[in-house]
Amino acid sequence: MKKILMLLMLLPAILMVAACENPDTKDKVVIDFWHMSPVGSPTFSKMRAIVNEFNNSQDKYFVKGTGFSFWDYWDKISLAISARTAPDLGLSTIDDVYGRAKGGVLYNISEMIAADTSENNIDLDEFRESQKQFARYEGDLYALPFTSTARVLYYNLDILAEKGFTEADVPTTWSELKTFAKHFDVVEGGDIQRLGFDPTYGNATYHGWLWQTGEDFFDEDLNPTLNTETHEFVLQWIKDFNSEFSRAQLQTFGESNNMLGIDPFAAERVAMIVNDDGLNQKIVDAGGTFNYGVAPIPIPDEDGIRVNWGSGFSIELYDNGKNDLARKEASFEFLKYLMSEETQIKLAEANGWIMSHISAMEKYTADKPLLAKILVEVDYAMDKVYVPYAPSWHGNDWQPFYTEALEGKKTVKQALADARAHYIQKKQNWEATN
């Protein structure tokens, strides 16, 4: 009797162990791949199918795919890299590959490509040099461009039609943008119900607007260039765009959008917005029924430059210091599969992203007019420079000063001066210890 009771007590543990033994992995090299399609997401089943196709195509390797939500992913991968427990393959941001490569946590992909004599090696000519340059460290590639993000101006055709406008009327310059946007503002009882446009919404950024003037946030020596007339002009233009509204009105409207939990353009609360290719998929996933289009982001009236912030994802092979050559080999084989023309098309279909493979995306967008327009803007996309003393220079470092200027707590000139002093101090502190 005691033996029977003991067996019954142990049975759950026995079943659990048995369940964990996957017969598909027997005698195979098992590697981990982290992505952004978690269980329950609209993209999960398609991403799983892509991984399974590789696993079923050969009997030497087995890839375990794990998906995290976009926001959870960054904390997970950052902690894993720091702890040297990173997956064999994962996604990151391409414009800061330099820091990870210098830190010794990435495998040298150039060496792996050079050593590969197979017929399915990676064709580097299929990836844009404008992205590959950010994936290099000391001349070699330590990552590959995974997506080719571009930012464009989305416009709601139904809202435009309310005022008798069509695609032919979509603005191309900053002055046209402001004049056009004012046709679509709706205010009821002192509360904003709809905005034509706001230069801080969506994926619009200060440095993105600045680049259109031909100026950058840093000079060639990575000193901040915040004390110029151009900076003052750009920041003042952003601040004044909706100056007929109080900051309280704009904040209330912005907060109400956040409470809805969806993009304000997808919710039809703004007529136009700057965003990336991902917004199109969000609208599709949300079941949006309104008509919309995309166009290049309007540029300054005088000497404006057609440029947008890319900020695409990189794909990286992580070196956790274990010298596991079998897993390294398996990771490279899976990388070749992911970067092939056929798989890049499937990844675009799964995620709604513009992927990095040039020929693949030309084929994928051939019968998709809106995505084809976004793909054109990829050739005008650029990434932000990596600044070792301020890796988050566009985010946590800049945002407090930007907000103070927008809220009127500081003048544009003072906010820029304080921001410049902040970066200079960070640079001095970094140089003193590096």
Give the location of each predicted region.
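Long, aromatic- and glycine/proline-rich binding clefts that accommodate carbohydrate-like moieties
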Residues: 20, 125-126, 295, 348-396, ...
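Extracytoplasmic/periplasmic substrate-recognition and gating elements
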Residues: 52, 56-57, 163, 243-247, ...
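Glycine-centered hinge/linker elements that transmit conformational signals in sensory
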Residues: 178-183, 221-255
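Hinge/lid segment of periplasmic solute-binding proteins
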Residues: 69, 94-152, 178, 209, ...
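Short helix-initiation/N-cap motifs at beta->coil->alpha
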Residues: 67-76, 172-178, 251-266
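Short, solvent-exposed loop/beta-turn-alpha elements that line the ligand-binding surface or hinge
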Residues: 110-127, 170, 187-197, 215-235, ...
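Extracytoplasmic/periplasmic solute-binding protein
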Residues: 137-146, 151, 175-225, 270
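Conserved N-terminal structural module of periplasmic/extracytoplasmic solute-binding proteins
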Residues: 18-105, 115-122, 167, 254, ...
